[in-house]
């Protein structure tokens, strides 16, 4: 049984979002590494309401499973209610009430699912203010320089809220009002239920407006309150991709600033993008053109960038990652990566290791202190500690049907242009000569050389490429040396 001290939150996410011009439901569009709806649910969960429900309509089959996943991540239940026909926000709330206990008598917060920057502090402040004043409804408002498209707040000369008029139904004088409805409310649930039963669709949209509840409750003589939010971005909604980009940039500005205040140097905030779930240690330097995405974790005293994109990558303390694209990988403490390295999923680079210029790795474990300096592909491989892989080497992992692994031991030295044809094992302390194709296992401490003796065919250029620049150069060199052209009889 509920009590007057309980809190419930309804998130309205049933609209089709046609102005997004997208096959993706509006609330699933992302900024800062999360969808708009996910941002909002994470914020609401911090308030810890007794009940949390989302009202879905358009594309509910796609959204509901994601809500279940987020509920698991947040460790709390999130109910789903369905608005089968789009009949306005008032009808959406009526549908949402079905997800609450019939006897629920606490505070009911209603918000839209397209306000991704709404934070827990703002919601908690709304609930506290509403409870303290014992109002029938408390509405969040904000002031905009361009209020086009927003419902306007109507007040008496005594500054009391009398109604909210939607933009489409507002008169010219009402459209001059810059204080707007933020779309976030706290209701006395009993009063709300009563008002919902008296809503009318006699308006420009022929819908049941939740905002009309304000005038109905005032007509009942019940107290109406408003709480103004100075930071309008916290309650800004998204209706199109221009607004999505604007809020995405604002969210990123706040994320970057928070890291800077926590001791991270961000050289150029304007070209640095950091998702909400990224962590960065103090005294790390982030250079221009860097994107840190997903659940990337950067240690302290690191150097990242410029022109680096890391998604779900962990980087240990003191590491350097320069001009690198990485996904689903791990870089050990003190390691160096780049420039122009490509870390594909499953890459694990040990402490003090090196992946140099134009190195690509995939599903590979590279041990402590091991160096892969340049121009090399390491795929499906395990390399031990303190080994060195020569330039232009390739771990040949695909036989045309399946991927196979290569194992290279510790303290191994391989020559340039070595091909490791998997499956093959190179033992500890072994060497390979330049140009070696390793098709069989190499014992520990052995030198593997696959090439035969070099054979020089004298005079080949003169005979096969007569008159060419190469032939003329060779003839001049031979004359300068006082010799007869190679291959010419005495």
Swiss-Prot record:
Localization per Swiss-Prot or TrEMBL: Cytoplasm
Which annotated residues bind Mg(2+)? Answer: 114, 239
Gene3D superfamilies for the chain: Hexapeptide repeat proteins, Spore Coat Polysaccharide Biosynthesis Protein SpsA, Chain A
Any idea which residues are catalytic in this one?
374 (proton acceptor)
- Listed binding positions for UDP-N-acetyl-alpha-D-glucosamine are 12-15, 26, 83, 88-89, 112-114, 151, 166, 181, 239, 344, 362, 377, 388
Q: Ranges of Low complexity compositional bias?
A: 467-490
> EC?
2.7.7.23, 2.3.1.157
From the UniProt record, which GO molecular function terms apply?
A: glucosamine-1-phosphate N-acetyltransferase activity; magnesium ion binding; UDP-N-acetylglucosamine diphosphorylase activity
Q: How is the cofactor bound?
A: Binds 1 Mg(2+) ion per subunit.
Q: Which cofactor does it need?
A: Mg(2+)
Tell me what reaction this enzyme catalyses: alpha-D-glucosamine 1-phosphate + acetyl-CoA = N-acetyl-alpha-D-glucosamine 1-phosphate + CoA + H(+); N-acetyl-alpha-D-glucosamine 1-phosphate + UTP + H(+) = UDP-N-acetyl-alpha-D-glucosamine + diphosphate
Renumbered residue ranges of the record's region Disordered: 462-490
Q: Which UniProt keywords apply?
A: Acyltransferase, Cell shape, Cell wall biogenesis/degradation, Cytoplasm, Magnesium, Metal-binding, Multifunctional enzyme, Nucleotidyltransferase, Peptidoglycan synthesis, Repeat, Transferase
Q: Positions of the region Linker?
A: 242-262
Pathway(s) served:
Nucleotide-sugar biosynthesis; UDP-N-acetyl-alpha-D-glucosamine biosynthesis; N-acetyl-alpha-D-glucosamine 1-phosphate from alpha-D-glucosamine 6-phosphate (route II): step 2/2; Nucleotide-sugar biosynthesis; UDP-N-acetyl-alpha-D-glucosamine biosynthesis; UDP-N-acetyl-alpha-D-glucosamine from N-acetyl-alpha-D-glucosamine 1-phosphate: step 1/1; Bacterial outer membrane biogenesis; LPS lipid A biosynthesis
Amino acids binding acetyl-CoA: 391, 397-398, 416, 434
Which family does the entry's similarity section mention?
Answer: In the N-terminal section; belongs to the N-acetylglucosamine-1-phosphate uridyltransferase family. In the C-terminal section; belongs to the transferase hexapeptide repeat family.
Q: What is annotated about its quaternary structure and interactions? A: Homotrimer.
Name-wise, this protein is Bifunctional protein GlmU
Q: Which organism is it from?
A: Mycobacterium avium (strain 104)
Organism phylogeny:
Bacteria, Bacillati, Actinomycetota, Actinomycetes, Mycobacteriales
């Amino acid at each position: 049984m509920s009590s007057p001290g309980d809190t419930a939150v309804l998130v309205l996410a049933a609209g089709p979002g046609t102005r997004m011009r997208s096959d993706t439901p509006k609330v699933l569009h992302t900024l800062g590494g999360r969808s708009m709806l996910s941002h909002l649910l994470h914020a609401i969960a911090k308030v810890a309401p007794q009940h949390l429900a989302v009202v879905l309509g358009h594309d509910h089959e796609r959204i509901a499973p994601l809500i279940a996943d987020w509920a698991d991540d947040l460790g709390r239940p999130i109910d789903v209610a369905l608005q089968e026909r789009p009949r306005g926000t008032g009808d959406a709330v009526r549908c949402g009430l079905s997800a609450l206990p019939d006897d629920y008598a606490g505070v009911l917060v209603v918000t839209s699912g397209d306000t991704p920057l709404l934070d827990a502090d703002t919601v908690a402040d709304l609930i506290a203010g509403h409870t303290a004043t014992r109002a029938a409804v408390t509405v969040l408002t904000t002031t905009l320089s361009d209020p086009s498209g927003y419902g306007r707040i109507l007040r008496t000369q005594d500054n009391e809220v009398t109604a909210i008029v939607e933009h489409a139904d507002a008169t010219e004088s009402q459209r001059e009002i810059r204080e707007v409805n933020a779309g976030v409310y706290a209701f006395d649930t009993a009063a709300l239920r009563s008002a919902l039963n008296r809503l009318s669709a006699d308006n420009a949209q022929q819908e049941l407006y939740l905002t009309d509840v304000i005038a109905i409750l005032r007509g009942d003589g019940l107290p109406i309150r408003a709480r103004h939010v100075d930071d309008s971005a916290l309650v800004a909604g998204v209706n199109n991709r221009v607004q999505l980009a604007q809020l995405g940039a604002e969210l990123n500005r706040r994320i970057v600033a928070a890291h800077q205040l926590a001791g991270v140097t961000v050289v150029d905030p304007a070209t640095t993008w950091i998702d909400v779930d990224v962590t960065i240690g103090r005294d790390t330097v982030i250079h221009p053109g860097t994107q840190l995405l997903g659940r990337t974790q950067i240690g302290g005293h690191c150097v990242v960038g410029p022109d680096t994109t890391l998604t779900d990558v962990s980087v240990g303390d003191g590491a350097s990652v320069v001009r690198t694209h990485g996904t689903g990988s791990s870089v050990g403490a003190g390691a160096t990566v780049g420039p122009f390295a490509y870390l594909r999923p499953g890459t694990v680079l040990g402490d003090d290791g090196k992946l140099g210029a134009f190195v690509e790795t995939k599903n590979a474990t590279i041990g402590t202190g091991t160096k892969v300096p340049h121009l090399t592909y390491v795929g499906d491989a395990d390399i031990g500690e303190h080994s060195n892989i020569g330039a232009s080497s390739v771990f040949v992992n695909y036989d045309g049907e399946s991927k196979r692994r290569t194992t290279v031991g510790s303290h191994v030295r391989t020559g340039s242009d070595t091909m490791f044809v998997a499956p093959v094992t190179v033992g500890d302390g072994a060497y390979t000569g330049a140009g070696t194709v390793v098709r069989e296992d190499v014992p520990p401490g052995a030198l593997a050389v696959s090439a035969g003796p070099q054979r020089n065919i004298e005079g080949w250029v003169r005979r096969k490429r007569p008159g060419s620049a190469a032939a003329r150069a060779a003839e001049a060199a031979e004359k300068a040396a006082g010799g007869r052209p190679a291959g010419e009889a005495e």
